[in-house]
């Protein structure tokens, strides 16, 4: 088994899927023969009708589930061959925003956003100002010491996005990241994603928001009937 590539190692493809099929239980396949490659530093939208498999595809890329068939490489690693401990290391290089947000209720909003930095071993004095500044930028300056349970859906979404980007991940995966915010905040969050991409993060955003997609010239991965094509 090849060792895990070190953080920062150059790879020719940040994401590589070959002939991916996915089914849940004995049902029909959700994804069929999905094949595509994305280069490091790329920015793509993932679009398609509800139920087309966008969330399932992001879960595959974050290694939350395994494909029924086919191969997946993320950040240069064959995810079928990495050990559980190395899978955890690989996930720390990925920022993820799911639709259910997954904020930890026993932590404040500030602590939730700071968690990736704390887990990576950084000292609080090195990131305290960065976390505070980011929370203010996404409009949560007055909520940073609040528990997630009292946040609105849009506020939880912004906190989850801040947590996903605070550590400047190599890859950002976001599932409908602007679904609970107003158009003005959606544009602000898009600027955040674009700036993160400019600094080197590869970005893949699943969205139905055509107005949001029209604001950039980023290519789209379109899912339809379990198949994907780049448009």
Please report, for each region that a protein language model flagged, where it lies by residue.
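Conserved ABC ATPase signature
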Residues: 147-151, 155
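A short, proline-enriched helix->beta-strand linker immediately N-terminal to the Walker B motif
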Residues: 166-170
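Helix-to-loop junction immediately C-terminal to a conserved catalytic motif
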Residues: 62
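ABC ATPase NBD coupling module
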Residues: 79-95, 196-198
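Conserved ABC transporter NBD signature motif
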Residues: 70-78
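Short coil-to-helix segment of the ABC ATPase nucleotide-binding domain corresponding to the Q-loop/switch region
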Residues: 107-115
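Catalytic Walker B motif of ABC-type/P-loop ATPase nucleotide-binding domains
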Residues: 172-175
């Amino acid at each position: 088994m090849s060792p895990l590539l070190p953080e920062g190692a150059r790879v020719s493809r940040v994401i590589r899927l070959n002939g991916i099929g996915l089914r849940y239980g004995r049902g029909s396949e959700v994804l069929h023969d999905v094949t595509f490659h994305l280069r490091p530093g790329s920015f793509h939208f993932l679009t398609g009708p509800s139920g087309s498999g966008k969330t399932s595809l992001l879960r595959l890329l974050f290694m939350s589930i395994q494909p029924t068939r086919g191969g997946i490489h993320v950040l240069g690693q064959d995810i079928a061959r990495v050990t559980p401990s190395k899978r955890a290391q690989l996930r720390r290089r990925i920022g993820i925003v799911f639709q259910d947000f997954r904020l930890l209720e026993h932590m404040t909003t500030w602590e939730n956003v700071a968690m990736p930095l704390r887990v990576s071993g950084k000292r609080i004095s090195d990131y305290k100002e960065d976390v505070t500044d980011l929370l203010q930028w996404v409009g949560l300056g007055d909520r940073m010491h609040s528990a997630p349970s009292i946040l609105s859906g849009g506020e939880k979404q912004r906190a989850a996005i801040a947590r996903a980007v605070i550590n400047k991940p190599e890859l950002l995966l976001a599932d409908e990241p602007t679904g609970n915010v107003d158009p003005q905040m959606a544009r602000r969050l898009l600027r955040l994603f674009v700036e993160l991409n400019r600094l080197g993060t590869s970005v893949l955003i699943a969205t139905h928001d055509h107005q949001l997609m029209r604001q950039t010239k980023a290519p789209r991965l379109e899912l339809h009937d379990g198949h994907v094509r780049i448009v």
